[in-house]
Amino acid sequence: MMKKDKKKVYLISNGDFRDSAGVVCWPKQEETLKAVQKALRKLDFDPQVIPSYDPKRKHGFLTKQYEGTQAFSKIDPTASVVVVLSCWAYSHHVSGPLQTHQGPILLLANFDGTWPGLVALLNHSATLDRLCVKHSRLWSETFGDDPDFMKRLETWCKTGEIKYDKCHLVSAEEMNLSSKAAQFGEKLAKKILHEKRIMGQLDPGCMGMLNAVINPAKLGAIGMPIELLNQSDLVAEMSLVDDYEAQSHLNWLIKKGAWFDWGTDQFEHLVHSQVIMQMKMYSAAVRIYQRYGLSAIGIPYQVGLVRSVPASDLVEGMLNNSERPEVIDPETKKVICKGKPIVHFNEGDIGSGVPQVLMRDIYEAKGMPPETTLHDVRWGREYEGKFIWVFEISGGAPPAHFGGWKNAKIYRQPKMYFPLGGGTCSGVSKPGVITWTRFYEQSGEIGMDCGTGEVLALPDAEVNDRLKKTTSEWPIANVHIPGYDRDQLMASHMSNHITIGYGNILEEFVATCLHLGIPTRVAGEH
């Protein structure tokens, strides 16, 4: 009797563009691959790892799109494929080949703070959704020792898909909005459609995040047309800012109580020259915002500026804050947007920029603090019976979210990703009710997910442990979203990013979206 051949499953190791990151992350990827291989063999499948380990590069990741296309050209186009994610990875390395792949596709990630495969999974999934590529999601902390993981993996191996209960998502049209909120939303939507809100996006497609790029026709239809700008122009504008102006901005921050983690070695520490360049970038961004009549601006930084200037993150935190150094318009000699935040969407992610502008307009109309920011959905775990998310932006949040500049800490960005350094704008987000949002494009249609939650004040030991397990230099928000815990969010969230602002404006936000013609879902309890 002939032995039955085991079905092959290809395990794809997608990674970062930077080999330095690949070297650091490879041991964890290797550990994850072994766990997934073991799990598949338990189910009588034959896992094949692609690409092979490269001894010269000291890792086995795909690091560019062409490497992804080459890898997929060598496998059966109908084969089962698992993209194994144990760290941050650029989704466009594999999204092109996956668009034409005919076999089942699974995005599989660890659920870990230090090694954020879950962040990459959410980004990859949102990218594939935008490109109309059918796929499934799966995540775990322990893989083969996790019964739910094994059950779902077996289901995917047999059927080619995994389905999740998404009863935590409700169409906003089913909400019983107050008449006051409905009228508010109608009025604001009419104002936006009449006046427009121009979205300034510098060099779209940061780090391969195609989910951060939205069809211009869809944006224009909701009154938020795109202004495509170049980061090279930002650098050129920086050269026009003199040292005196830059130093004045830095002096302002120090006077307000911002703490700088100064050092002497520019390759390891935060030094004065790095921050002066950041202050020039701040003035340049404000003037570009004014010149083009923008309602928001998004600086991707990675990878386009990483070899040119220090990090943009301190700049981003300053822009998104009402209390910030004044910048003068060289033509009118007037202060630009005095006493107001200039909405900045991190990493040029228009999926955050759109709700940030809507939230800003709502907050200002209601006389509430208008600061907003996006965060990575970085990790989470239970604390005293509640699942508390670690939301962590990769460098700069508005100090208003920490309770003011006196609570802001500026660290050097980690050298692995930021060789030219530059400061973060970090702190621990203050306790309070928040509204969260996410705008996206899926299968050719736009959508908005939103809800409410609460930033919690955790004991210092717990906060420090969460920072230690993620990235200690970055801003953190410890957030509980009732009804949107680990498995609910991981099953349905439409990005690796989530946008937050303080105060409950959910009804006004939903009403505005519906009147703009944006299909909207409300997640969790509300």
Question: Residue ranges of each PLM-predicted region?
Answer:
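An N-terminal assembly and electron-transfer interface module characteristic of large anaerobic redox
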Residues: 1-526
